[in-house]
Amino acid sequence: MDSPLINSPVKHWCEFEFISKTVKNPNIHIKGNYSYYSAYWDQGFERCVVRYLHDKASTAEKPIDQLHIGNFVCFGAECVIMMGGNQLHRPDWISTFPFDTRSFLPAGDTVIADGCWIGSRAMIMQGVELGEGAVVA
């Protein structure tokens, strides 16, 4: 079978992406150069892993939760990092339906410390802080 993987720039199952070289979002802060994403099956870290993070820089008028990633962090294929605060869903209102943009609440920054290992298809929720060497399966 000579056809490339559908919708994927990755040519082989063992390819990976050094995220410090590819991430452009000003709200993602990467410490060091050795954190990587096992990019098999999809279109890269920023597009497929980080969800609901605005690509405009945070300002005093419009603060945006930040994603901080340490050095030597390993991200497995198809893992997900949820961002975007409460995504307009307010459990303290009569309905969790996102009726109004004023219903947004920030969740706080998400921090993934040095040496963490995020397994394939694992999910990290917004506002979480993972300590050094944490493993998420």
Predicted regions and their residues:
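Detector for Asparagine
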Residues: N7, N25-N27, N33, N71, ...
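DNA-contacting interfaces and partner/effector-binding or oligomerization modules
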Residues: K21-T22, I30-Y34, S38-W41
